């Protein structure tokens, strides 16, 4: 039973850690592309900003789901 709980704790930690890492990389790339597009065509900044925030929310939603599942694994399944 102890080994099973340890594996579940490690799985939950990996889900949260890798989810945060993936979101950070994704938002960093997205922000870089936004700045690149804004520098090339400044007149499109309002449209680009709207699209940037929509896509940033979608990129950030997947890690939040992973964090929710990790909390479930840590507190409901392993606890």
UniProtKB/Swiss-Prot annotation:
GO molecular-function terms, A-Z: lipid binding; proton-transporting ATP synthase activity, rotational mechanism
- Where exactly are the transmembrane stretches of this chain? 10-30, 52-72
Primary localization class, coarse: membrane
Which SUPFAM superfamilies does this one have? F1F0 ATP synthase subunit C
Annotated Gene Ontology cellular component terms: plasma membrane; proton-transporting ATP synthase complex; proton-transporting two-sector ATPase complex, proton-transporting domain
What Gene3D superfamilies is this protein classified in?
F1F0 ATP synthase subunit C
Provide the alphabetized UniProt keywords: ATP synthesis, Cell inner membrane, Cell membrane, CF(0), Hydrogen ion transport, Ion transport, Lipid-binding, Membrane, Transmembrane, Transmembrane helix, Transport
Name its cellular compartments: Cell inner membrane
In the bilayer, the protein is annotated as: Multi-pass membrane protein
Query: Which PROSITE patterns does this entry report, sorted A to Z?
Result: ATPASE_C (PS00605)
How this chain assembles, per its entry, is: F-type ATPases have 2 components, F(1) - the catalytic core - and F(0) - the membrane proton channel. F(1) has five subunits: alpha(3), beta(3), gamma(1), delta(1), epsilon(1). F(0) has three main subunits: a(1), b(2) and c(10-14). The alpha and beta chains form an alternating ring which encloses part of the gamma chain. F(1) is attached to F(0) by a central stalk formed by the gamma and epsilon chains, while a peripheral stalk is formed by the delta and b chains.
In Swiss-Prot or TrEMBL terms, this protein is called ATP synthase subunit c
Q: What is the lineage of its organism?
A: Bacteria, Pseudomonadati, Pseudomonadota, Betaproteobacteria, Nitrosomonadales
């Amino acid at each position: 039973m102890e080994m099973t709980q340890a594996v579940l704790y490690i799985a939950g930690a990996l889900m949260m850690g890798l989810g945060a890492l993936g979101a950070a990389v994704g938002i960093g790339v997205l922000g870089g592309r936004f700045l690149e597009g804004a520098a090339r065509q400044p007149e499109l900044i309002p449209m680009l900003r709207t699209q940037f925030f929509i896509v940033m929310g979608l990129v950030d939603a997947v890690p939040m789901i992973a964090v929710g599942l990790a909390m479930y694994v840590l507190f409901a399944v392993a606890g």
